[in-house]
Amino acid sequence: MHLGCEKNLVDTEHMMGLLDQGGYSISTNPSEASLVVVNTCSFIQDAREESVRVLVGLAEQDKEIIIAGCLAQHFQEELLQSIPEAKAIIGTGDYQNILNVLQRIEQGEIVNQVSNNPTFVGDEKLPRFRTTGKAVAYLKIAEGCDYSCAFCIIPKLRGMQRSRSIESIVAEANQLAKQGVKELILISQITTNYGLDLYGRPCLADLLRELGDVEIPWIRVHYAYPTGLTSEVIKAFREVPNLLPYLDLPLQHSHPDVLRLMNRPWQLDLNASLLDRIRSELPDAIFRTSLIVGFPGETEEHFNHLVSFVQTQQFDHIGVFTFSSEAGTKAASLANQIPFSVAEARKDKIISIQQPIAELKNQNWIGRTVDVLIEREDKDSAEFVGRCARFSPEVDGFVRLQINNTFTNQLNIGMMTPALITGADLYDLTGQVV
């Protein structure tokens, strides 16, 4: 079972690949399994609560459990003591040892397989059992993070940054191309810092140009940080033919005071000028960002600055989150903690401001002919449902294609087809195959 982000998902797929290679029978239905591996999330309190609910539910079914991932890395031995059904814990840098852990369990051992300082990063040689469907795959280009944002525990959970070599990443991309992947999504904690630890400088632009020769129609980049979007990187976005002009930028806030409290001083006064530069160099850019409201010390003035920033910048997509106080982070001990009700009200206001912007952005696509990657058929509404370059999986909207008898027999899940966009609402587009 997989909980949490797509980086966790890749780890889960590697564990499944190893189990499959080791001769174990895999089921995605826990009721059919004698032992359940749960790859957990511990990023924020809500994620921990979800992980614990799942674990308790399995324990109540008398399932033997292996607890893997961030929750195991975070709480370690405490989990084994509090959940008797847990036969092992596996840390974020230890999932490659899943077969050895199982063998030790079979010999009656309770296993603690957690490295305090994770150093492992998977590569193209590690078996992988993909769960995202034939057409879409995530590719982890690095693991860990060297930053110390005041609100974040990721460096403690996943260790310092470890980049894969360009050759390794391209090799896996070619493997995925042979499997029929149409969309490849590059992920790490900070994709724009890729290569800094390995090559002594950020090498995302070099990597993107190498991936331009891979026979995958769409390559999408997630988790790009502002300072890493140099003119060289933007030039690669402009020139690499299969690289989508989709920029996922976790800006978090706009006001310099809040950014300083977040320990993101490198971003001060950068946001607006950065976005203006990107728009001039990459006019077709699609912008997604994530924002945190209710951060300790965020005043009404700070929040109004963020409101103005959202209104001015006109992002295509925004994810808004209320601050979650995490033990062990600098932000947890900051003065002037914001009441939850105030943070929720601020979140709701940002969402209400963004919604008409998002709808207008969608409406601007009416009349365009775009490629759509078909992901499922909705027989109830007589539509094929997919995505165009504007929408990333899980976080954005869909394109709903009205089924035309002329083309119905030519369409299959996992294929790309040109479509004329004929309508738009707050979240989705509608279109017709052409």
Curated annotation (Swiss-Prot):
Domain (TRAM) spans 363-434
Instruction: Tell me the GO molecular function terms.
Output: 4 iron, 4 sulfur cluster binding; aspartic acid methylthiotransferase activity; metal ion binding; protein methylthiotransferase activity
- Write the record's keywords in alphabetical order, separated by commas: 4Fe-4S, Cytoplasm, Iron, Iron-sulfur, Metal-binding, S-adenosyl-L-methionine, Transferase
What cellular component terms from Gene Ontology apply here? Answer: cytosol
- Residue ranges occupied by any Radical SAM core domain in the UniProt entry: 131-360
> Can you give the residue ranges of the MTTase N-terminal domain?
1-107
Q: Which reaction does it catalyse?
A: L-aspartate(89)-[ribosomal protein uS12]-hydrogen + (sulfur carrier)-SH + AH2 + 2 S-adenosyl-L-methionine = 3-methylsulfanyl-L-aspartate(89)-[ribosomal protein uS12]-hydrogen + (sulfur carrier)-H + 5'-deoxyadenosine + L-methionine + A + S-adenosyl-L-homocysteine + 2 H(+)
Per UniProt, the enzyme's principal EC class comes to transferase
Q: Does the record carry rRNA-binding as a key word? A: no
Q: Where does [4Fe-4S] cluster 2 bind?
A: C145, C149, C152
Per UniProt, the cofactor note for this protein states: Binds 2 [4Fe-4S] clusters. One cluster is coordinated with 3 cysteines and an exchangeable S-adenosyl-L-methionine.
Per the UniProt entry, the disulfide pairs are: none
Against Pfam families, the record matches this protein to: Radical_SAM, TRAM_2, UPF0004
Tell me one GO biological process term.
tRNA modification
* EC number from the UniProt entry: 2.8.4.4
What InterPro entries is this protein classified in? Answer: Elp3/MiaA/NifB-like_rSAM, Methylthiotransferase, Methylthiotransferase_CS, Methylthiotransferase_N, Methylthiotransferase_N_sf, NA-bd_OB-fold, Ribosomal_uS12_MeSTrfase_RimO, rSAM
Q: Which domain of life is it from?
A: Bacteria
Where is the major localization of this protein?
cytoplasm
Entry binding sites for [4Fe-4S] cluster 1: C5, C41, C70
Subcellular localization, per the record?
Answer: Cytoplasm
Q: Which cofactor does it need?
A: [4Fe-4S] cluster
The record's comment on protein family reads: Belongs to the methylthiotransferase family. RimO subfamily.
State what this protein does.
Catalyzes the methylthiolation of an aspartic acid residue of ribosomal protein uS12.
Name of the protein in question: Ribosomal protein uS12 methylthiotransferase RimO
